[in-house]
Regions:
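Pyridoxal 5′-phosphate
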Residues: 1-365
């Protein structure tokens, strides 16, 4: 990223050195994200962030809706995969149906969505993994059911990206969004869309902008330094498995498998430790298995979430408190009005020692 800013780039398509550099950066970033998603580079677009992209896509899709149609959203999602769709549906006079996650387990069973599907539903929007309580959703099953009902599928993979190998072909989704800062890159948003879906989408754009995907979805001049950072982040993830043979996609597969194993070990250690702290309650899936990632929402009896986070910060452990934009999750759990929950998460660079430090800090409250 610093090299791009230091060396300088121009806009795309100029036919001179600094413009050619921007072209190369863009091409390489599309290839990198195509490898990460198991997609084609022509199906990858970039934007400011996932939220901005979702607002743009929701407005474009809403122009194809009519009164009598319906959409399905969920109570498990980050608000960026909820409010843009609800606002678009409200403005289009379209019914909003909400699939609820299970309060006891934190899981969103595909059957909760299936019950809401009929010929009226034109879109299902759901997360791959919850940013609040760590639940992993069986989005392949959701996609199959939604498509059978004639609906499009829009997946929020922001929270899943650093924890799970993403495969848009296996998911059979129409759209998928992610944010590169979540997988250790710069602040930017990435959109995958099936090529025919992108081509048919009437997006809001200025007249000189490209009329074909993927460029038609990229409003204004993009952050080329961020695109370079995205490529570097994908290469970093691919390198975690070592320098063995295979394509970048194959190396990503190996890396994410190692990450998954390591994070499961940390999660098991954390859950075993928390079980000995009767004042601490973990919300969501209670075991460290494929139904969750290593993201835990906690309530501590007698202590507000903000106070707990502040105490952990004093011993060098930085965790979130509140709702983390998962407003519906906190509402459904009944904790939104009391300050939300503490969120503690583990990724590939965390250690067992850090898990123990977190447990000790919770025990000392």
């Amino acid at each position: 990223m610093s090299g791009v800013l230091r060396d300088g780039v121009s806009n795309l398509g100029g036919g001179f050195g600094s413009s050619d550099y921007a072209d190369t950066i863009t091409i390489e970033a599309r290839r990198a994200m195509a490898d990460m998603f198991s997609a084609d580079p022509s199906e990858i677009s970039f934007g400011q962030n996932m939220t901005s992209i979702t607002f743009a896509v929701s407005r474009a899709l809403a122009n194809t809706w009519a009164p009598g149609d319906a959409i399905v959203v969920t109570s498990l999602d980050h608000d960026a995969n909820f409010t843009p769709w609800v606002r678009a549906a409200t403005e289009a006079g379209v019914e909003v149906r909400i699939a609820e996650f299970d309060l006891a387990t934190g899981e969103l069973d595909p059957s909760a969505i299936a019950r809401l599907l009929d010929a009226k539903v034109c879109l299902v929007a759901v997360c791959v993994a919850s940013n609040a309580i760590g639940t992993v959703v069986d989005v392949a099953s959701v996609g199959a059911m939604a498509h059978e009902a004639g609906a499009l599928v829009y997946l929020d993979a922001v929270h899943a990206a650093p924890h799970r190998l993403l495969d848009v072909r296996a998911f059979d989704c129409d759209f998928l969004v992610a944010s590169s800062y979540k997988f250790f890159g710069p602040h930017a948003g990435i959109l995958y869309g099936k090529l025919d879906r992108l081509a048919a989408l009437e997006v809001y754009k200025v007249r000189p902008a490209p009329s074909d995907p993927p460029g038609k979805l990229e409003t204004g001049t993009q952050s080329f330094e961020s695109m370079a950072g995205i490529t570097a982040a994908v290469d970093y993830l691919a390198a975690l498995a070592g320098s063995g043979p295979g394509s970048r996609r194959e190396r990503l597969d190996r890396s994410l498998s190692l990450i998954n194993d390591h994070e499961r070990s940390l999660s098991e250690r954390f859950l075993e430790g928390v079980a000995s702290l009767p004042e601490v309650r973990v919300f969501g899936v209670p075991t460290a298995d494929q139904r969750r990632v290593g993201t835990f929402a906690l309530g501590v009896t007698g202590h507000g979430a903000e106070a707990v986070a502040a105490q952990l910060a004093r011993v060098g452990l930085y965790v979130w408190s509140g709702h983390y934009y998962a407003v519906n999750v906190m509402d459904r759990l009944g904790v939104h009005d009391t300050g939300g929950l503490v969120r503690i998460g583990f990724v590939h660079y965390n250690t067992a020692t850090e898990v123990d430090r977190a447990l000790e800090a919770l025990a000392d409250l």
